[in-house]
């Protein structure tokens, strides 16, 4: 039986998301492979992706009340993971995502979704971690919103 990690890699290859060759990453680093998460384009794909992330979440015993999906690619990942956790594993967590700029009308604020509160444990859901730029951008926003404990 394949592990969730093996099934995830197989899924990425089958969907032409994981590519092999000589690539220059956004960070400027060279790599023998590239993950093009923009190739996930269907409900079936994003549902499967959410399940792989949910399995990883559970395998690593992540203790979080809320999943944060940094704009933009992290948004569907946080939503799909929250759905998979609730539907397939009986684990109900909130989700939210940051805006690129603070909204000063309507509901306002920097985040959409589950409200972050002091003492909350949150997990940041990202598609690919290379340079950590997305984390460096979203962490100050999170800390400004509430004093939370963050896992990535």
Language model segments and positions:
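PRPP-associated nucleotide enzymes
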Residues: 1-126, 130-152
């Amino acid at each position: 039986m394949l592990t969730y990690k093996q099934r995830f890699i197989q899924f990425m290859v089958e969907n032409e998301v994981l590519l092999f060759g000589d690539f220059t990453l956004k960070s400027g680093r060279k790599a023998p492979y590239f993950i093009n998460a923009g190739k996930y384009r269907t409900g079936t794909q994003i549902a499967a992706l959410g399940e792989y992330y949910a399995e990883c979440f559970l395998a690593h015993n992540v203790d979080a009340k809320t999943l944060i999906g940094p704009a933009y690619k992290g948004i569907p990942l946080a939503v799909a993971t929250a759905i998979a956790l609730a539907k397939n594993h009986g684990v109900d967590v909130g989700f939210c995502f940051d805006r690129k700029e603070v909204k000063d009308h309507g509901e306002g604020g920097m985040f959409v979704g589950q409200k972050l509160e002091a003492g909350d444990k949150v997990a940041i859901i990202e598609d690919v971690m290379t340079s950590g730029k997305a984390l460096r951008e979203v962490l100050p926003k999170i800390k400004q919103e509430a004093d939370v404990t963050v896992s990535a």
